[in-house]
Amino acid sequence: VWQKVITDVSELSGLPNNALGLMSQAASQKKLKGYLINLEIPTYLAIMTHCDNRELRKELYLAYGARSSRSGPGGEKYDNTEIISELLEKRQDLAKVLGFENYAELSVAKKMAGSPEEILSFLRELGGKAKPQAEEEMKQVEIHAREVHGLEKIEPWDHSYYSEKLKQDLFEVSDELLRPFFPAPRVLEGMFEVARRLFEIDIEENNNFVTWHDDVLTFNILRKGKVLASFYLDLYARENKRGGAWMAEGRVKRINLQGEKQEPVAFLTCNFSGPIGPNPALLSHQEVVTLFHEFGHGLHHMLTKIEVAPVSGINGVCWDAVELPSQF
């Protein structure tokens, strides 16, 4: 697993104090001195967006992009090339057995889109409209990097950094300046209040659940004192945790074989910047948006009235339709 320890803080110039604190804390937890740089998304984004050290940005960018490949950290030990090739072959075999020409047709059969061609047509149309705007914005970043910062040629590891510089120069705003407005406990309080107003529910912490990490919080959803559902909330990035953000079913709402009602349980998982010492985690605006998004999926799963498991909650909903409730 790729990681790097930096002892000279000048090599990390430009990084916000929050990011430096997380890296220092990560090093201390491993009994190391200095700042631990790894490929966890809060660290990666902080370096790519704010760090003045171009060589470090390049090193991190290449390591991140080569994960699980023979050219990545760990070499062939973590190379997934053969696994991916085998997966593609077996998907094609499965599609043929089920009467489809390819796996794309099999996948689309369970979705709203009519065919792979329809999806490609949609993507080409979307790309045709979005690409000119993206190219214009990228051109502005390149001009700004050249004329203001003296960079002749912009590389992939420069994009986020100089986009942030342009945003600061044009609008005098930065995501880091917004973090103090979004302490995690206050964000949860506000999100739960929105849900209370919209759905007439109460959300209460329940410490009786056993969890897999001290960071994990557990809650019950109630209406008029009756428990409707429960969920686990695992917000922060940590070593060996799967990246990204998602909602997963722990248990679906259903009537079991004994005729008893089973209430749903959800897992809401993110990889946000964690707390530093005794202080609460300060979320970025994008992390707040992500949290609301995943909570939307969770509400879809947990507030269902359907008691037949295959069509309860998110089950039986096409994957290209299931994102609608997540826009909560």
Segments (PLM) and residue ranges:
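Active-site-proximal, well-structured secondary-structure segments within enzyme catalytic domains
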Residues: 2-38, 85-86, 90, 96-274, ...
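Substrate/cofactor-recognition hotspot
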Residues: 35, 41, 60, 69-70, ...
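Propeptide (latency) domains of metzincin metalloproteases
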Residues: 36-37, 48-50, 59, 100
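His/Glu-rich zincin catalytic helix
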Residues: 41, 49-54, 218, 237
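Short, charge-rich amphipathic alpha-helices with coiled-coil/heptad character
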Residues: 50-71, 110
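Alpha-helix N-cap/helix-initiation motif
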Residues: 76, 80, 180, 184, ...
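Active-site recognition of the HExxH zinc-binding catalytic motif
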Residues: 92-99, 195, 274-302, 326
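Zinc-dependent metallopeptidase catalytic helix centered on the HExxH motif
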Residues: 290, 298-328
